[in-house]
Structures are given as structure tokens and as C-alpha cells.
Amino acid sequence: PEDAPDCEAVEFLIQEALRDDPAPLYIAAQGAMTNIAAALNRAPEIASRMTVLWNGGGPYPAGRPEFNVQQDPIACRVLLDSAVTVWQIPQDVYAKFEVSLSELALRVRPCGEVGAYLFQQLMDEYPSEYDPRFPLRTGGNWTLGDNTTAAVLPVSYTHLRAHETRS
């Protein structure tokens, strides 16, 4: 559509999907599906040439509103209605991918100013009491959320191309 973002990420997705490369293209999507949907709208022929690993959707099978879906529900519909192979990781699954706060204190906080800053940002967001409406931060653990996509990337390939884009 005319309102599809014109950005580096969309162009990169299209170029990578159209590459003459026997290795499969896995896209570990984090956040909204806006750029993926825009690439599919611009070049629908890329759908069969990629697999999207996506953290999104409420608990299976009932579902409910979920942050990554709510950011751009139309883009989610474009993705799910396409021929793209989607490995969906719903909230009840990705919420189990946790790291302890003590491990973050041990491995992140001592990493200079950036590590101390990141650790403090997590602590500032950490609730002082359990909230059953927000199960992502409970007890002494922090759910890593969207990072679950990296954990399920196939590791059997000898090369993986990584590229970060921002729209």
C-alpha cells in the first residue's frame, strides 16, 4: 500500500529474500511486524523465500491482546495471511525464557557505564510486588521477551548473516 514505510529495513528484507543463495532466510523479528508486512506488500513473491520467527500473540490457544500484536495489528494480519512460514512464539511460551536478576547483576552490571546503566534501567522497571496481570517479571527473574527469537534460530548452519536496521 501507499502507506508502507520507505526505509532501509524494508529494502534490505526484499534484497535478502531475492538473493540467489541456497541457505534459507530466517528473520528473527522483534516488536511490530510493520517492516515485514511492508516488504511483503511491495514484493509478494518473497513470501515463499523466508521464515519469520516471531514473538507475538497471547497465550495459546485462547489468545488475548499482546504487545507485539497491538503495535501494528494490520501488519500481523498481512504476515499471517501471506505464504510466509511463521514460527510463532506466543506469550505463554516466551514468558518462560528468563534470566535471574542475580545473573544480570553478575554479568551485565560490571560491564562499564553501559552495563551499569542497562542493569539500573531493568531495576527501575522491576515491580516491587507480583502483578498477575503482568507475568513477565516475577520473583527473582526477568523474562527476556523478544530475545526468544534468537534462542530458536537454527544453529546447524555454518554461516548466519546478521543485520540490524531501524525504521
What are these regions (language model features)?
Residues 2-101:
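Active-site histidine-anchored catalytic micro-motif
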Residues 158-165:
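Conserved small/polar residues in nucleotide/adenosyl-binding loops
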Residues 145-156:
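Short, hydrophobic/amphipathic alpha-helical patches that form generic packing surfaces
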Residues 29, 140-143:
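Aromatic-acidic/polar surface patches that form glycan- and anion
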Residues 76, 116-119, 147:
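A general structural signal for well-ordered alpha-helical packing
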Residues 59, 156-157:
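Short Gly/Pro-enriched loop/turn and capping motifs at secondary-structure junctions
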Residues 85-141:
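Active-site rim beta-loop-alpha module in soluble metabolic enzymes
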